């Protein structure tokens, strides 16, 4: 058994290229390639309400973003699709989505983007999607005069479902050929997850001075996320898949499957 470290986008590419047999994957990349993959049971990253680390920060209310330029981070495709679904289906707007790298500049108000100019490439951004630490900081201390919105909370409020951001998956061919190995790895990962959750308060205290954030905030963040994958997460993933189809980021609803000892079982 060999462990391969890597950022999420690299791990996504490697399992799809057959360079990895089992890997965490972003939800949208799993859904786009579900025919060749199987879900590992009871492992994932989800929220059932606030997520605290995915935020839309806007200089205007989200219902006023129609035609406005909205920056979407290039580091999280799942969050990108989530933002599109919420903006189009729940807030009823169709912004101009602008891919950008993390650490970009500030926002401009609606007066800086007149209707005659707001689709030009040089126009300023009116809203931006933040991921990870920047989102955590923005939601902790919102900038005055902005709308700072937790997208996990909005998803659950509008749909009633939890939001699944990442799953653990195995290549289907590998899972069918080596079911015992997949089951063993699943058990190891589950035990590691449980140990990490027990150590979450200590981890929060260690990270607090490095991140310049209160330990209580970090501990709340760790406890807010859900790290399992059961029926509620499956329902949430299916709901997200439906939204992704409707906004054009998924061609069709995939047939989902998960691994079990000795077989690949359909996830109904």
Walk through the language-model features, giving the residues of each.
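Short helix-initiation/N-cap motifs at beta->coil->alpha
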Residues: 2-13, 93-107, 112, 116-127
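Beta->alpha turn/N-cap motifs
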Residues: 7-9, 19-31, 36, 41-43, ...
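Hydrophobic residues within well-ordered alpha-helices
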Residues: 15-16, 244
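A conserved helix-loop-strand patch within extracytoplasmic ligand-binding domains
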Residues: 43-103, 148, 155, 172
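Periplasmic-binding protein-like
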Residues: 46-55, 141-174, 217, 221, ...
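Immediate post-signal peptide segment of exported/extracytoplasmic ligand-binding proteins
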Residues: 62-68, 246-247, 251-254
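Pocket-lining segment of extracytoplasmic ligand-binding domains
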Residues: 99-107, 118-204
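Secondary-structure end/capping motifs
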Residues: 176-243
């Amino acid at each position: 058994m060999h462990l391969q470290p890597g950022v999420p986008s690299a791990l996504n590419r490697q399992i799809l290229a057959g360079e990895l047999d089992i890997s965490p994957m972003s939800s949208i990349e799993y859904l786009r390639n579900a025919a060749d993959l199987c879900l590992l049971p009871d492992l994932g990253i989800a929220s059932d309400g606030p997520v605290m680390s995915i935020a839309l920060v806007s200089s205007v209310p989200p219902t006023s973003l129609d035609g406005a330029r909205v920056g979407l981070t290039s580091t999280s495709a799942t969050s990108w699709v989530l933002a599109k679904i919420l903006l189009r289906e729940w807030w009823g707007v169709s912004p101009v989505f602008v891919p950008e790298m993390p650490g970009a500049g500030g926002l401009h108000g609606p007066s800086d983007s007149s209707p005659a100019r707001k689709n030009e490439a040089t126009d300023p951004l009116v809203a931006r999607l933040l991921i990870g630490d920047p989102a955590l900081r923005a939601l902790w201390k919102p900038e005055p005069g902005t709308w700072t919105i937790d997208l996990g909370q909005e998803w659950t409020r509008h749909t009633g479902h939890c939001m699944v951001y990442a799953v653990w998956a195995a290549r289907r061919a590998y899972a069918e050929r080596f079911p015992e190995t997949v089951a063993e790895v699943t058990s190891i990962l589950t035990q590691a997850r449980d140990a990490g959750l027990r150590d979450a308060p200590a981890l929060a205290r260690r990270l607090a001075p490095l991140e310049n954030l209160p330990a209580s905030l970090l501990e709340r963040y760790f406890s807010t996320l859900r790290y399992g994958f059961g029926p509620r997460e499956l329902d949430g993933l299916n709901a997200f898949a439906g939204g992704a189809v409707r906004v054009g980021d998924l061609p069709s609803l995939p047939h989902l499957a998960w691994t079990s000892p000795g077989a690949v079982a359909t996830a109904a």
